[in-house]
């Protein structure tokens, strides 16, 4: 029987050989069963190990339990690359984890989405809810919370804040219950950002976007204690969509970049200079995109702290 598994690859890149040879493969490890296991996020942990999150649909092999559909799948590795725990969480429908961070009070915070309203899932407001769960250091569930409305909602990225809270970003079609400021029509998605306290209680939740579809992929904290979110906006075509908010969720600025085809931002970071680097994929050959060598290229843009474009490069 074919096994579809998480696969872990670790590379060593000696600085003095950076341009001389391919990275050296140190080790690989796979975990899974006879169905599908997929990883979406990996974080380093304070003990020198790391944690991965994704989903599992297996009931055999390395997977001890499946509640139904796909379950959240969380694996903790030690500093010596040994599995410390492997856990699945969910109900009778689909549950998926997409992002994780170490908790302030020990253990781990994991965000994702769920279409389940039974098992360990505390009800479901609509078609899918944004989900955050907290485990202890051994992977035992401490609490799980759902957020959203009566339509489709989910979390894509979650981080820690400066005031021992957590901030998540994701996508929503809802305009009720926790989400009451939907911007576009019901069939269009907004970016959402929510703040929760140490116990998962919702502090605030805001929507950002346009009359089209808006999606987020990553959120980061900036040196001035604000937050940057990257993703894409789809009106006629997808464009990079970058926005900056303050600690209360107020919009500081928002920018779009791209051309007349699909351009989607997946990663964002703030440099020591205060400039902002964004990367993703571009299929455009016009507008802000100077050159594409193939059907799709890795498109990197550099912005100043106010979101103005400084330069762009395509690689591929």
Region locations from a protein language model:
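Bacterial Sec-dependent N-terminal signal peptides
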Residues: 1-24
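A sequence-level/structural motif corresponding to short, flexible coil/turn segments enriched
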Residues: 19-316
């Amino acid at each position: 029987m074919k096994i579809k598994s998480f696969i872990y690859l670790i590379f060593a890149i000696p600085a003095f050989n950076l341009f001389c040879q391919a990275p050296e493969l140190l080790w690989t490890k796979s975990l899974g069963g006879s169905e599908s296991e997929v990883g979406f996020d990996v974080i380093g942990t304070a003990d020198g190990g790391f944690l991965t999150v994704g989903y599992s649909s297996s009931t055999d092999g390395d997977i001890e339990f499946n509640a139904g559909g796909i379950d959240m799948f969380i694996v903790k590795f030690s500093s010596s690359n040994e599995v410390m725990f492997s856990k699945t969480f969910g109900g009778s429908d689909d549950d998926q984890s997409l992002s994780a961070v170490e908790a302030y009070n020990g253990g781990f915070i994991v965000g994702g989405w769920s279409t389940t309203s039974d098992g360990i899932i505390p009800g479901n407001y609509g078609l899918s809810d944004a989900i955050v769960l907290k485990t202890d250091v051994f992977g035992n569930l401490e609490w799980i919370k759902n957020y959203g409305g009566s339509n489709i909602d989910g979390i894509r990225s979650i981080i820690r804040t400066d005031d021992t809270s957590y901030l998540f970003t994701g996508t929503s079609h809802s305009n009720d219950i926790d989400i009451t400021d939907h911007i576009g029509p019901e069939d269009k998605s907004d970016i959402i950002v929510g703040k929760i306290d140490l116990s998962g209680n919702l502090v605030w939740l805001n929507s950002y976007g346009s009359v089209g579809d808006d999606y987020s992929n990553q959120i980061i904290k900036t040196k001035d204690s604000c937050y940057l979110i990257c993703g894409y906006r789809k009106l006629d075509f997808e464009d990079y969509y970058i926005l900056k908010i303050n600690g209360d969720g107020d919009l500081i600025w928002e920018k779009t970049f791209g051309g007349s085809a699909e351009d989607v931002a997946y990663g964002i970071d703030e440099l020591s200079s205060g400039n902002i680097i964004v990367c993703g994929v571009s299929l455009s050959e016009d507008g802000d995109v100077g050159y594409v060598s193939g059907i799709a290229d890795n498109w990197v843009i550099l912005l100043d702290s106010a979101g103005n474009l400084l330069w762009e490069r395509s690689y591929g």
